[in-house]
């Protein structure tokens, strides 16, 4: 593990960990999923780095074919675990899923900002933050959304899990392809366009 990644993780997690002693109940649980996303990002970074150093894959091939698989599986693990073990209410499952994605995206953007300091302009940094941040949130939210149905039916549980993961992996891969194309704006607009339907659904289902 690179010392830089560990230091960034500690610097981000240490202040947030103080809130664990203040929050109670559902708030503490949701914060726990934020931590899970942050940790999974650091873990995914190590796996992706191993692929990069031990194979002849190009950056384009790696980001389109490998990292979506690694990252989406790791992000989905906490969501799948609580869906099948604790069987929470759909609203809580959706909130937990998006918090894992947000935690992952936050850690990833901090690492990108640290490693690319001076190489990216302000517009590129902001665009990357919005695009990748929302993409990770939406892809994990999609898994949580699918789990609200799959976890309620034994017949759908295994097939639903595979379908949810496959969808999030393909979505992630399409995003990575778009942002590296000649029209990166399409990649940035993709998560924005897909987040809106989820937002409307959650607000509609939320108890008054």
Spans of model-derived segments:
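Hydrophobic alpha-helical segments at protein termini of multi-pass membrane proteins
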Residues: 1-208
């Amino acid at each position: 593990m690179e010392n830089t990644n560990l230091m960034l993780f500690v610097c981000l997690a240490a202040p947030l960990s103080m809130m664990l002693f203040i929050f109670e109940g559902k708030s503490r649980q949701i914060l726990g999923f934020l931590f899970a996303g942050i940790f999974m990002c650091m873990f995914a970074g190590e796996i992706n780095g191993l692929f990069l150093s031990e194979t002849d894959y190009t950056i384009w091939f790696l980001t389109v074919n490998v990292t979506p698989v690694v990252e989406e599986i790791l992000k989905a693990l906490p969501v799948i675990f609580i869906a099948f073990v604790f069987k929470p209410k759909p609203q809580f499952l959706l909130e937990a899923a998006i918090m894992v994605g947000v935690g992952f995206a936050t850690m990833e953007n901090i690492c990108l900002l640290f490693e690319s300091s001076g190489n990216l302009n302000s517009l590129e940094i902001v665009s990357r933050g919005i695009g990748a941040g929302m993409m990770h949130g939406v892809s994990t939210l999609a898994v949580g959304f699918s789990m609200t149905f799959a976890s309620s039916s034994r017949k759908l549980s295994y097939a639903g899990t595979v379908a949810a993961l496959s969808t999030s992996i393909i979505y992630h891969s399409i995003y990575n392809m778009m942002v590296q194309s000649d029209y990166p704006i399409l990649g940035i607009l993709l998560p924005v366009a897909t987040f809106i339907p989820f937002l409307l659904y959650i607000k509609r289902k939320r108890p008054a």
